[in-house]
């Protein structure tokens, strides 16, 4: 059995409902519904969720670990939430959050406007910092990757949009 799939999920302040092939996790920050693969059994034991494969096949074993990680992320998301921090490096690079839009000045001849999907919020504590928050880990990471994709860090000066914890290795310029 999968090592990840064996460990139970603690439901710290989250309610879980199992209904016809789907699990709904409800918490103080919102609700996430996730389809459960038929090769995985989910059991709710007062305060913890236990997942187990239906049979001893490799696929069921692998999916039990995957489903456990996805459900654990949903529980974490509805109780504490997820956030991803981005930093803008470069002269004149600025960000401004306006409602569900993120306005970016990234050295192009036009401003870049990124529309935030439902359930995701962007904050700009300073003009060069962006904090993307939400309850769905996958969506938060996807939006952060899309924003970074507008101007990824270049290898010579390091200018561009980077994750706050990202280390950009700079190349040396050509010498004559």
Curated annotation (Swiss-Prot):
GO terms for biological process: cytoplasmic translation. The keyword Ligase does not apply. The keyword rRNA-binding applies. GO terms for molecular function: rRNA binding; structural constituent of ribosome. Keywords: Ribonucleoprotein, Ribosomal protein, RNA-binding, rRNA-binding. InterPro entries: Ribosomal_uL6-like, Ribosomal_uL6-like_a/b-dom_sf, Ribosomal_uL6_a/b-dom, Ribosomal_uL6_bac-type, Ribosomal_uL6_CS. One of its GO terms (cellular component) is cytosolic large ribosomal subunit. PROSITE patterns: RIBOSOMAL_L6_1. Belongs to the universal ribosomal protein uL6 family. Part of the 50S ribosomal subunit. This protein binds to the 23S rRNA, and is important in its secondary structure. It is located near the subunit interface in the base of the L7/L12 stalk, and near the tRNA binding site of the peptidyltransferase center. This is Large ribosomal subunit protein uL6.
């Amino acid at each position: 059995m999968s090592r990840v799939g064996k460990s139970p999920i603690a439901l710290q302040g989250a309610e879980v409902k199992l209904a016809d092939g789907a699990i709904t996790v409800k918490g103080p920050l919102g609700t996430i519904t996730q389809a459960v693969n038929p090769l995985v059994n989910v059991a709710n034991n007062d305060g913890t969720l236990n997942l187990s494969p239906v049979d001893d096949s490799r696929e069921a074993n692998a999916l039990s670990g995957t489903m456990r990680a996805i459900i654990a992320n949903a529980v974490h998301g509805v109780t504490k939430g997820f956030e991803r921090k981005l930093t803008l490096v470069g002269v004149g690079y600025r960000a401004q959050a306006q409602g569900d839009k993120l306005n970016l000045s990234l050295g192009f001849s036009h401003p870049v406007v990124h529309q935030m999907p439902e359930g995701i919020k962007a904050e700009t504590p300073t003009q060069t910092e962006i904090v993307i928050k939400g309850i769905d880990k996958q969506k938060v990471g996807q939006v952060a990757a899309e924003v970074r994709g507008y101007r990824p860090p270049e290898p010579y000066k390091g200018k561009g949009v980077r994750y706050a914890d990202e280390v950009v290795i700079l190349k040396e310029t050509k010498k004559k």
